[in-house]
Structure formats: C-alpha cells, structure tokens
C-alpha cells in the first residue's frame, strides 16, 4: 500500500516532514529528478477545483470536477481527498530546526533563490541549528479523506467527455487561530487511484 500508516508513524515522530509522492516516493535532500519524472507522467482524468466562502464567511464550499482525458482501465476506481492550506504564516516565537548554516558561506553563493533566507547569518539562533523569522507557506490546516480519498466521492464508470462532480464543505474556519491572512488560503483537491494506491492528479485554488 502506498499510504499504509501515514508520515508521522513511518518517517518522523517529532519533526515536521515532507513526502512528495505520486507513484514513487520522493525523499532525500534533492528530489528534483524524481519530481520532474512525476510531472511528466500522463494522467487519465483531468481535475479542477473551485472554492468560495458561504454567506456567513465561516464555511468554505468546494466543488471539484473530474473529466477523463483518456479512458481509464475498467478496473480502476477513484476517490477525492482535500487539504485546506494556509500561507504567509509567521511568528517571532517560532523556530525551525534546520541544518543549512553552511549556506552562509561563499561556497553556496550559487544556490537557488529559495535558499536566500538561509544565507543570512542573522536568521540563525542556538548554535546555528535553528532559524527564526521564517515564513511558512502551504501549511495544512484541515483535511478530508487525505489517506485514501473520501468514500463514494466518485462512483460509476468513467466515460470520456463526461464530467463527474463532487462537493464538500470546510466548516467553522474561525476556529483556526493559526490562519493569519484569509486571502492566502487554498484548497487542494487530490485524485486518488484507489485500485492501485497512488495519487493520479491534483488541483488547487484560492478561495
């Protein structure tokens, strides 16, 4: 099974982890080549997602549309899962454990732009093992069906040019004090191939 017991159990019990996976696991310090290979894979269905606030401003209504661009194998079954993410999160009290202090040296002057934050010595504390002032993006706030997809979210056979629609709601968003800017919320819709235990396609949108 591709997702037998979750990230925290399998990889890191105490530290945040990132596992970027579709058919293959992408891990290690540099998964660029595997990531590019995953992007080049053709998917059977297209997926599109839209999200909007309801009249109370406290719930997010989500609509996902799935349309086959090729006819999937007859035995394949699919389901949709969702993640609500927040970006732009920052707190002076937050520290992130990082081992990137070597990037402050000229040896890494040609590092990609995303490493610029780690090139500044003033961002390090506690023996250069933690960084402060980091802005966290794409932080998961709430999920639905994140391991296998929501049961019965997509039913029946898939026919080319025939759109299947699924709707859901993220409720009581005001309960999440972690959210700092509602304009930086996104909904990610994940299309699971439940027959072969893999992620087939993904779409995301702003609310």
What are these regions (language model features)?
Residues 1-207:
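Short, conserved sequence motifs used for protein processing/export or organelle targeting and
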């Amino acid at each position: 099974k591709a997702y037998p017991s979750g990230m925290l159990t399998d990889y890191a019990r105490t530290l945040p982890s990132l596992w970027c996976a579709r058919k293959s696991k992408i891990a290690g310090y540099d998964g660029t080549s595997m990531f590019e290979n995953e992007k080049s894979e053709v998917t059977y269905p297209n997926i599109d997602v839209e999200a909007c606030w309801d009249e109370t401003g406290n719930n997010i209504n989500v609509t996902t549309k799935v349309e086959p661009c090729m006819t999937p194998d007859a035995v394949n079954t699919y389901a949709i899962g969702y993640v609500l993410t927040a970006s732009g999160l920052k707190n002076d009290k937050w520290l992130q454990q990082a081992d990137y202090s070597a990037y402050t040296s000229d040896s890494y002057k040609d590092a990609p732009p995303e490493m610029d934050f780690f090139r500044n010595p003033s961002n390090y504390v506690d023996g250069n093992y933690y960084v402060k002032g980091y802005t966290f993006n794409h932080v998961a706030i709430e999920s639905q069906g994140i391991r296998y997809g929501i049961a019965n979210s997509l039913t029946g056979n898939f026919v080319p040019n025939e759109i299947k629609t699924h709707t859901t709601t993220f409720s009581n968003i005001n309960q999440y004090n972690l959210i700092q800017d509602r304009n930086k919320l996104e909904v990610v819709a994940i299309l699971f191939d439940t027959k072969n235990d893999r992620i087939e396609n993904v779409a995301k949108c702003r609310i």
